[in-house]
């Protein structure tokens, strides 16, 4: 339907930027919240969920730096909104949302610094898709990995990372960010315990029958890594 067309195009645009950066041997940087005149639920930042949605989807698909739309907002009739400061030079509603998301990205970046991304993809309407060479395909994505998504209640984007024998998976809620709905995901974990990074903090969680069940918040993301591997 139209919504999934927009969402898949959103992912493919990011994937194409990533491919160009890789071909040029450059780190990938992306621009978030530049304009909200088209599908504002994705591109706005009036709520934390909207800002986190943009940032973590870009981060999951390879960005290691993000530019935010931060100069004075043009007239509202121009259909541009959610700058970090208003036309009067005052902090806008987006300011605190972006500040919180930036702190989480910084903490996550330090956590992932020695990891290498080995595959990325999405689950859209229950269908697993691989993101490769700038396109979204209906091919299986995980293979024989110690961590992988088994099921997702709603749409998610993910990337699998490796550090030697250690693996981890970054999962971002790709559901409508203004809905406020949680998104239940089930992750295969080849360990009795997993380290779960969320909201700038890491906690250890027991895994029942080799699985971890977690409810992602609106716009939220988690990084999961088996303990003791």
Functional labels for PLM-detected ranges:
Residues 1-9, 34-48, 87-90, 175:
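The substrate-binding groove and active-site-proximal loops of carbohydrate-active enzymes
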Residues 3-17, 45-52, 94-101, 183-187:
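Well-ordered, non-membrane alpha-helical segments in soluble/globular domains
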Residues 14-49, 77-85:
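Active-site clefts of carbohydrate-active enzymes
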Residues 27-32, 59, 65-69, 170-171:
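Structural recognition of the beta-strand scaffold that forms the well-ordered cores
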Residues 49-103, 118-128:
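Aromatic/acidic polysaccharide-binding cleft in carbohydrate-active enzymes
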Residues 123-192, 219:
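Carbohydrate-binding surface patches
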Residues 188-202:
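Solvent-exposed beta-hairpin/edge-strand motifs
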Residues 207-229:
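C-terminal beta-strand-rich structural cap/linker in extracellular carbohydrate-active enzymes
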């Amino acid at each position: 339907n139209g919504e999934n067309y927009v969402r898949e195009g959103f992912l493919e645009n990011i994937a194409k930027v990533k491919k160009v950066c890789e071909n040029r041997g450059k780190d990938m940087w992306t621009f978030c919240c530049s304009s909200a005149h088209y599908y504002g639920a994705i591109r706005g930042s009036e709520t934390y969920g909207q800002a986190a949605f943009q940032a973590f989807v870009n981060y999951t698909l390879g960005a290691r730096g993000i530019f935010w739309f931060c100069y004075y907002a043009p007239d509202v009739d121009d259909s541009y909104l959610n700058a970090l400061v208003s036309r009067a030079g005052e902090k806008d509603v987006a300011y605190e949302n972006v500040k919180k998301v930036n702190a989480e990205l910084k903490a996550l970046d330090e956590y992932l610094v020695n990891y290498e991304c080995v595959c990325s993809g999405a689950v859209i309407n229950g269908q697993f898709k691989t993101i490769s060479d700038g396109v979204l395909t209906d091919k299986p994505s995980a293979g024989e990995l110690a961590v992988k998504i088994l099921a997702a209640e709603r749409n998610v984007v993910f990337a699998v990372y490796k550090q030697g024998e250690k693996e981890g998976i970054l999962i971002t809620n790709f559901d409508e960010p203004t809905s406020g709905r949680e998104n239940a995901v089930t992750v295969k974990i080849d360990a009795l315990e997993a380290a779960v990074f969320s909201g700038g903090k890491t906690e250890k969680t027991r895994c029942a029958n080799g699985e971890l069940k977690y409810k992602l918040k609106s716009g939220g993301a988690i990084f999961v890594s088996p303990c003791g591997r």
